[in-house]
Amino acid sequence: MAAGTTSDLRNGIVIRYNNDLYQVVEFQHVAPGNWRAFVRMKLKSLTTGKVIEDRVRAGAEIDIVRIERRPMQYLYREGDSFIFMDNDTFDQIPVSADLVGDAVRFMKENETVDLVYDAEKDTIIGVELPIFVNLKVVETTVAVRGDTATNVTKPATLETGAVIEVPAFINEGDVLKIDTRTGEYITRV
């Protein structure tokens, strides 16, 4: 854990704040007229996924947490755990469903994802997917002919079980490029 000040804040870094690990989503240095300067922060909890907003005095000490990303292959789900394999040592590592969180919507077996570790404690704090994944449509409704006056969307179930909105021309069996940050359809592959 490295001590720093609010001047060391950057988007994306992880800090220990109120006994929890948070990723800095956004920050802004504010210096109102004749008041003391402060830093407004938007932080995302790595344990709950909840986003909070808070402010601290400018120059205040913060604990910057060093994190590591290690590529791992997702193997399978076993009860309330997900089993990953280290690509270098071939060790199998169970990760609880709480730490995987929403990433499960777009995780396909045998795909490589990044496990995020707290480098000081060598503990897993989360799972990061690639920004884009290619997934197959296993179920969708048939588009109604002539219903193309506007951008019509319909629900489609992907091979991972996730349901997303797709354009009317998408059919079962199509492979789609999905943005894992937003869960939105990008293009047909």
From Swiss-Prot:
InterPro entries given in the database record: Elong-fact-P_C, NA-bd_OB-fold, Rib_uL2_dom2, Transl_elong_fac_P/YeiP, Transl_elong_KOW-like, Transl_elong_P/YeiP_cen, Transl_elong_P/YeiP_CS, Transl_elongation_fac_P
PROSITE patterns in alphabetical order: EFP
A GO cellular component entry from the record: cytoplasm
Molecular function terms from GO: translation elongation factor activity
Known function: Involved in peptide bond synthesis. Stimulates efficient translation and peptide-bond synthesis on native or reconstituted 70S ribosomes in vitro. Probably functions indirectly by altering the affinity of the ribosome for aminoacyl-tRNA, thus increasing their reactivity as acceptors for peptidyl transferase.
Family: Belongs to the elongation factor P family.
Protein name: Elongation factor P
Lineage: Bacteria, Bacillati, Chloroflexota, Chloroflexia, Chloroflexales
Gene: efp
